[in-house]
Amino acid sequence: MSKKFAHTQEELEKLSLKELENLAASMREKIIQVVSKNGGHLSSNLGAVELSIAMHLVFDAKKDPFIFDVSHQSYTHKLLSGKEEIFDTLRQINGLSGYTKPSEGDYFVAGHSSTSISLAVGACKAIALKGEKRIPVALIGDGALSAGMAYEALNELGDSKFACVILLNDNEMSISKPIGAISKYLSQAMATQFYQSFKKRIAKMLDILPDSATYMAKRFEESFKLITPGLLFEELGLEYIGPIDGHNLGEIISALKQAKAMQKPCVIHAQTIKGKGYALAEGKHAKWHGVGAFDIDSGESVKKSDAKKSATEIFSKNLLDLASKYENIVGVTAAMPSGTGLDKLIEKYPNRFWDVAIAEQHAVTSMAAMAKEGFKPFIAIYSTFLQRAYDQVIHDCAIMNLNVVFAMDRAGIVGEDGETHQGVFDLSFLAPLPNFTLLAPRDEQMMQNIMEYAYLHQGPIAFRYPRGSFILDKEFNPCEIKLGKAQWLVKNNSEIAFLGYGQGVAKAWQVLRALQEMNNNANLIDLIFAKPLDEELLCELAKKSKIWFIFSENVKIGGIESLINNFLQKYDLHVKVVSFEYEDKFIEHGKTSEVEKNLEKDVNSLLTKVLKFYH
């Protein structure tokens, strides 16, 4: 087995500093090479290479819990842990996950932000109860510190005597947001008479050196800013080391050894460069955070030239049009401005649209208050991340019956990011909520109509749309959106009906076209609304079609099948329902087309299943 990258703690300890630096350089080359082909999180991993090497050198990865927040910076850890032979399969079907997974030998699963410190605290408690001497090490980015959960954990950790190391990877991705509001409080500690007097003396001294005064003044201000995070952690009762150079292996190793020897909760503040080692990525955080395949030399994305507009781009343009038309429209995103397309609205209307960092709970409740004040909030959020604010959705929006719009991006299978990111639960957790209206567009024109309707609608409303492009284009004429009204797209006397929801309509249409080529037919309904259902249309359909196939990109439990069965029971209608929604299991990573084939949700597999009902 090749051991170019895989090293035990003992092996790393025997390497010289120069050899460790060469190892880091080789790992960067490997990461760039693989991500350029498979896509993935590039810049965050390039910025954490030395941190990961130092963790493996100072601590024992076989016994000490290594916890990677979000874990989108864990590629070096994977290489060091013996995954180099399968690293080329990163994010591929049946290959290595882009995140940490226990099934691959990691301590804990990760994919969502700000869980690492809580996990470290829990691990500390378990270790203490077992009487063991292990030390949890949590690597967390500064962006993740914008979420309240991280501070909840720090609050408890600071009041403990646990041996625990928090390695803060400060790559300035969003340090101004997690630290910004708190630094206003902390800056009061420096706004004393002594500090102000001292600052004036330094300023007078700099006047004597006119050529370097500007530079020195800037460095002076920066040096005081560096104190801010240290004060925060120390006031919480944590030991603090830093800031250190997160790319200087000697500094990092020394700091980790110092923290290890303390046998107390300690924060090491390491400053890093996101995208380190790949010039095109350095300093361009958003572009190179999560990427598809790209050409290493030019940095250009490798994608089809005939690519259609994405659903996100369509959403962004439509919301821009609506915002220019209706001045009471406001909006928010939680650290995903470019991912949700809200960046363009923040740029054009900075007083009406906000990025509140990784703070989904705050995002939802703050918009609820704006709705209470007469504004019309659009919350642009990935389906998977709305899970993080479920209580706020219920408590602050549904119970209040407020006019809040939830635009749920990345609904359905999202592909290579895998089980932590699949958007297949939103229908199940939103449908039970009183006052909520749920719908989904099948194509671009229906997206426009639905967004216009959502603005006019009274009460909380949510619509979902896929990652990437809509499959359908202009195959069907759009209809006016009316509350709880479906659209009958293909109408005939067949005893079989296809009921599609959102992107599921496209899949149903693809199967139907194949059937028609075999001289078979079926009714095709675009439900448009999951809640409320079009009971009038469905009652009419039940008179002629006795076999209904459900096409929807949600799990079966709590999905369209559940809603349809409730409707049939309500009216004592006898129809056989066959659902092609997802089974009761988490969906692994891989290209969407390959994942669907594995799940037998591709068109050919669905066609085979449907044909069994034709005689």
Swiss-Prot record:
E.C. numbers: 2.2.1.7
Reactions catalysed: D-glyceraldehyde 3-phosphate + pyruvate + H(+) = 1-deoxy-D-xylulose 5-phosphate + CO2
Gene Ontology process terms (BP): 1-deoxy-D-xylulose 5-phosphate biosynthetic process; isopentenyl diphosphate biosynthetic process, methylerythritol 4-phosphate pathway; terpenoid biosynthetic process; thiamine biosynthetic process
Cofactor: Mg(2+); thiamine diphosphate
Subunit structure: Homodimer.
Biological role: Catalyzes the acyloin condensation reaction between C atoms 2 and 3 of pyruvate and glyceraldehyde 3-phosphate to yield 1-deoxy-D-xylulose-5-phosphate (DXP).
Family note: Belongs to the transketolase family. DXPS subfamily.
Name of the protein this chain belongs to: 1-deoxy-D-xylulose-5-phosphate synthase
UniProt source species: Campylobacter jejuni subsp. jejuni serotype O:6 (strain 81116 / NCTC 11828)
